[in-house]
Swiss-Prot record:
Coiled coil: none annotated. The active site is at H226 (tele-hemiaminal-histidine intermediate). This is Putative 3,4-dihydroxy-2-butanone kinase. Its EC number is 2.7.1.-. ATP binds at D410, G411, D412, C413, T455, S456, G499, T507, L508, D570, P571, G572. InterPro entries: DhaK_ATP, DhaK_dom, DhaL_dom, DhaL_dom_sf, Dihydroxyacetone_Kinase. The gene is DHBK.
Length: 594
């Protein structure tokens, strides 16, 4: 193991929960919900949701960016922070737990960085909370200025400028403003800020091998906070040159990302990405202020320098510039007890953790207990065979998926899919009602939702829920191949609807859509169902391989240059094709030996 991959940790799977426990020991004004490991929520110790008389400000996202977001929980800033696994969006249940814990009659505002997984998970949680009677608004922050105006649905990434939006919203809420006004101030603040980052090294996730993608003497402009590739790799330059370039990109009139012109008042935030010494950050600040004043004709009213939104151990920095007026300055100057704004840690220490709140009584459902049948029907045996083969194939493919994803994403596709597959294999032994295909599909979705973070987890949960609903429409006791095709069609439609992708976007749908087309064609032609599934599996594999030639239109791959995309297929599509093909082959073999 090389030096850069050394970590002061125990189990890589426990880093987020152990970080939260350490944070709470430092600051008596914070608590966490007693729901580890699925629920990882840090909240203000002085807030009780049902009695809280101000708008709650809630944010969060994947961990690995500390002190963001939990370090900015405190009076005058965030009311709660929802922590996902490292670089993975928090799950919907965790977000809902946070909403229920701190939201009173005034409602809550969710401030979400613009990443697909965060948008989907926070969006679904918001809709569920609304159905339970909570008032919820959501503001999405996309302050990235490094890349050209993006194509597709992904949009600009949320970066360190999000913290300035947190502060504005937190101060507005502390004044007692209603939810609509707080949301309006946050939205306006998000439109006033632009950010660009520069990395001298890529980050190393706990338990992962250090990437050598960024070599000696090189820097990467616009590298993402999850390690995804940026706008360009260049030779390392003196800091004066680098800062000048970054500010020109943020303030570029060609992209017009921020409404800042000569004579504007601005706020400057210099943010370390995790491994940059404070000395270097202060050097950057010392260059940036006169550059803004003399070269761009701006009045710099406030400067904040430190490591606020990091990327684990990445060496580098980001600069955020926000257009300011007196109203924004008043919000930024308002008092806060958020420990990493920073503020002191005075006050009595309450209990470190409190129970996870239950849903309101009117929405509590008495769910039936599901279990594995003592005796499997012929249909149950076939379903078990297909599930076991599909999940085992995903387990075996973990390293390949991670290798591909290291080039076009954040390198965790295989690990994420692996967690879901292992959970499916374990839960099937105890809980899956295999004689009931619809309920089994629903339970697969529950297994995935419990352990899989990020966009893959929520999309596969949506996939299973839609397939389950379609299968439940069937009144017959036996599910036929036509029923499975209809369920696959409904699942694909749901993923496309909520995820925003379709054929040609370089996603898992580029494997599943061809599979569905081939399956329906062969079944309509009267083919044997097992043979039809084999042919459709071949179509899935061909579709997945074809993603090498596609320009990404969804997810983090949107930000990756075309020459890198062309070197590997989409990991999500390859995973989908692999489990589909494994299931089809296993069912075919089962029929042949019957």
């Amino acid at each position: 193991m090389d030096f850069q991959s050394k970590k002061l940790i125990n189990d890589p799977n426990d880093v987020v929960t152990e970080f939260i426990e350490g944070l709470i020991e430092n600051y008596p004004g914070l608590q966490y919900l007693d729901g580890f490991p699925e629920v990882k929520v840090v909240l203000r110790a002085d807030v009780s949701g049902a009695k809280y008389d101000k708008v709650a400000i809630i944010s969060g996202g994947g961990s690995g960016h500390e002190p963001a977001h939990a370090g900015f929980v405190g009076e005058g800033m965030l009311t709660a922070a929802i922590c996902g696994d490292v670089f993975a969006s928090p799950n919907v249940d965790s977000i809902l737990a946070g909403i229920r814990a701190v939201t009173g009659p005034m409602g809550c505002l969710l401030i979400v960085k613009n990443y697909t997984g965060d948008r989907l998970n926070f969006g679904l949680a918001a809709e569920q909370a609304k159905s339970e009677g909570y008032k919820v608004e959501m503001v999405i922050v996309g302050d990235d200025c490094a890349l050209p105006p993006p194509r597709g649905i992904a949009g600009r990434r949320g970066l360190a400028g999000t913290l300035l939006v947190h502060k504005v919203a937190g101060a507005a809420a502390a004044c007692g403003l209603p939810l609509a006004d707080v949301a309006a101030e946050a939205k306006r603040a998000s439109e006033m800020v632009g950010t660009m980052g520069v990395a001298l090294s890529v980050c190393t996730s706990p338990g992962q091998v250090t990437s050598d993608r960024l070599g000696p003497g090189k820097m990467e402009l616009g590298l993402g906070i999850h390690g995804e590739p940026g706008a360009a790799v260049a030779d390392l330059q003196p800091v004066d040159v680098v800062v000048s370039h970054v500010l020109k990109e943020i303030l570029s009139p060609e992209t017009n990302y921020v409404p800042i012109t000569r004579g504007s008042r601005v706020v400057l935030l210099i943010n370390g990405l995790g491994a940059t010494p404070l000395m270097e950050l202060m050097i950057i600040a010392g260059k940036a202020v006169p550059e803004l004043q003399l070269e761009h004709g701006l009045a710099v009213d406030r400067v904040y320098t430190g490591s606020f939104m990091t990327s684990l151990d990445m060496a580098g920095f980001s600069i955020s510039v926000m257009k300011a007026d007196q109203a924004i300055l008043d919000r930024l100057d308002a008092p806060t007890k958020a420990p990493n704004w920073p503020v002191g840690a005075e006050g009595n220490r309450p209990p470190a953790k409190i129970p996870v709140p239950l849903p309101p009584s009117h929405s509590i459902k008495i769910e039936k207990t599901l279990s594995r049948p003592e005796k499997l029907s012929p249909q149950g045996h076939i379903l078990e065979t297909a599930i076991e083969a599909a999940a085992t194939e995903v387990v075996n493919l973990r390293d390949n998926l991670n290798e591909w994803d290291n080039k076009v994403g954040d390198g965790d596709c295989g690990s994420t899919m692996f967690r879901g597959a292992v959970a499916i294999l374990e839960d099937m032994k105890k809980y899956y009602p295999l004689n009931d295909p619809a309920e089994t599909v629903n339970e697969i979705g529950a297994s995935i939702g419990r352990v899989m973070g990020g966009t893959s987890g929520i999309l596969y949960s949506i996939f299973c829920k839609a397939a389950y609903a379609k299968l439940k429409e069937n009144a017959e006791s036996v599910v036929t191949a036509i029923h499975w095709a209809d369920a696959l069609e409904a699942a694909i439609a749901a993923v496309s609807k909520y995820g925003g992708a379709s054929a040609g976007y370089r996603t898992l749908l580029d494997a599943l859509i061809p599979a569905l087309s081939a399956l329906k064609e062969r079944l309509n032609a009267g083919d044997d169902p097992a043979d039809a599934f084999i042919i459709s599996a071949e179509a899935a594999s061909a579709g997945a391989e074809s993603t090498k030639h596609m320009q990404a239109q969804a997810g983090r791959s949107t930000y990756v240059p075309g020459d890198i995309l062309a070197s590997v297929p989409d990991p999500g599509a390859m995973a989908a094709a692999a489990w589909y093909r494994a299931a089809a082959l296993a069912v075919k073999e089962k029929y042949n030996t019957a």
